[in-house]
Design a protein with these regions (language model features):
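Conserved SAM-binding loop
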Residues: 98
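Conserved beta-strand signature within the Rossmann-like core of class I S-adenosyl-L-methionine
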Residues: 151-160
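Conserved SAM-binding loop of SAM-dependent methyltransferases across substrates and taxa
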Residues: 71-81
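Active-site capping/gating segments
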Residues: 160-188
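Conserved SAM-binding motif I beta-strand of class I
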Residues: 84-89
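S-adenosyl-L-methionine
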Residues: 2-57
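Conserved SAM-binding strand-loop segment of SAM-dependent methyltransferases
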Residues: 105-117
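Conserved class I S-adenosyl-L-methionine
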Residues: 58-68
């Protein structure tokens, strides 16, 4: 009798776990249908170089567009705790991960918004990081040309603004097929 009860409990637990996995996979896949690009994490090895290139100063406002899991926001917070940090993420799963990872940060210093970066006002940004596909980069350039604060510094990983010349290109000296090959720095 005890063995039957144990097997039934294990069976129910396996069913619950399988259902949870299916829900997470469906949630993830459906978020990809409505997002302009999938979530691709920034390689850990390049994060310090991104933070260095941003050169975030106290009191500045930093935007991470397509902030994914919040990795860049947390690195910037560790480097410059007196900056205001804003992450914008459209896809649900990375958004929730970023919210969870930044839950202990002061709300006046770090915020995660679930929104389209093209529909948010970006005019308060002093610094910005992007790791976005070319189609979205083209749309973002048009938006920034209209509303960027003079002096805005944008650091882009791998992808470029086709119609804007970077003020600096940093070769990250990564293996040929690895993500995170170059940082392009733009000034508006």
């Amino acid at each position: 009798m005890a063995m039957t009860w144990l097997l039934t409990a294990i069976y129910i637990l396996v069913l619950i776990l399988a259902a949870a996995v299916i829900v997470v996979v469906l949630f993830w896949e459906s978020s990809l249908l409505f997002a302009p690009a999938p979530f691709i994490p920034t390689p850990d090895e390049v994060v310090p170089k991104i933070v260095q290139a941003l050169n975030l100063q106290p009191g500045q406002t930093f935007y991470d567009l397509g902030c994914g899991d919040g990795k860049i926001l947390l690195a910037c917070r560790a480097n410059q705790p007196d900056a205001k940090l804003i992450g914008i993420e459209r896809s649900w799963l990375p958004y929730f991960i970023a919210r969870f990872k930044t839950r202990h940060a002061p709300k006046d210093k770090i915020a995660i918004w679930r929104a389209s970066l093209l529909k948010r006002d970006l005019s308060s940004a002093d610094r910005m990081f992007v790791y976005l596909f070319p189609g979205l980069m083209a749309k973002l350039l048009v938006k920034l040309q209209k509303e960027a604060k003079p002096g805005l510094k944008v650091v882009s990983l791998d992808f470029e603004f086709k119609d804007k010349t970077p003020i600096e290109i940093i070769d990250l000296k990564r293996p040929i097929k690895a993500l995170g090959q170059k940082l392009r720095i733009y000034q508006f």
